[in-house]
């Protein structure tokens, strides 16, 4: 009888732990995710976490993004980032600075692929946040760059946001004075895009 009660209590405790667990999401990108030019309370990580928590989700968003980071920079620091315990999802959003600097899409793809492989080796799910190149480096470059993210998503069966700045890029009302980095309203739009995908992924995870 005592043993039976003990087992029941143990099961209840485990259920309570699971029910109260906080999902941990790491944003791993560049200035577009880091919150460049904005006060801390307006950073994407804060806005996204507040929006999800306001809807009742137990979630922690960690800002693992670095302004100015290229895919090579991300590759150099991914091992350190993955030391964070109990990561439930890593959102990979690098490549914009590669594109702005005209770095070969072949190199960018190779770096992102290594980041994906290293993250996968830790059994951490990945959400890939893509970028699109303008035509300033030529149509051939744009075509090659734009194929990076769909190709990686297909190869590694990753959920994909085709364009992180969907509805924000090239719209002055959603960007800071430089015309590149989202302002608060733009950050809210990016956050809503990520929020929808995060909710979908965690619902699938719990089924």
Regions found by a protein language model. Give the residues of each.
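Bacterial N-terminal signal peptides
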Residues: 8-16
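Acidic/histidine-rich helix-loop elements
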Residues: 37, 62-70, 99-103, 179
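Short gly/ser/thr-rich secondary-structure transition/capping motifs
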Residues: 9, 71-75
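Bacterial N-terminal signal peptides that target proteins for export
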Residues: 1-9
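Serine-esterase "nucleophile elbow" of acetyl-processing enzymes
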Residues: 20-67, 77-86
């Amino acid at each position: 009888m005592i043993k039976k009660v003990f087992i029941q209590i143990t099961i209840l405790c485990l259920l309570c732990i699971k029910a109260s667990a906080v999902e941990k999401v790491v944003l791993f990108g560049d200035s577009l995710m880091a919150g460049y030019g904005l006060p801390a309370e307006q950073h994407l990580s804060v806005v996204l976490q507040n929006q999800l928590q306001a809807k009742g989700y137990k979630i922690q968003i960690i800002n693992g993004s670095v302004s100015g980071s290229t895919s090579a920079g991300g590759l150099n620091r991914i091992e350190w980032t993955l030391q964070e315990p109990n990561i439930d999802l890593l959102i990979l959003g690098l490549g914009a600075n590669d594109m702005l600097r005209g770095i070969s899409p072949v190199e960018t793809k190779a770096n992102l692929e290594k980041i994906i492989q290293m993250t996968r080796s830790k059994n951490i799910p990945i959400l890939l946040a893509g970028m699109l190149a303008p035509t300033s480096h030529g149509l051939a470059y744009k075509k090659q760059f734009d194929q990076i993210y769909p190709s990686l998503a297909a190869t590694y069966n990753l959920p994909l946001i085709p364009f992180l700045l969907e509805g924000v890029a090239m719209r002055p009302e959603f960007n800071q004075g430089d015309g590149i980095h989202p302002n608060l309203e733009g950050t809210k739009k990016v956050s809503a895009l990520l929020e929808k995908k995060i909710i979908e992924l965690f619902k699938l995870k719990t089924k």
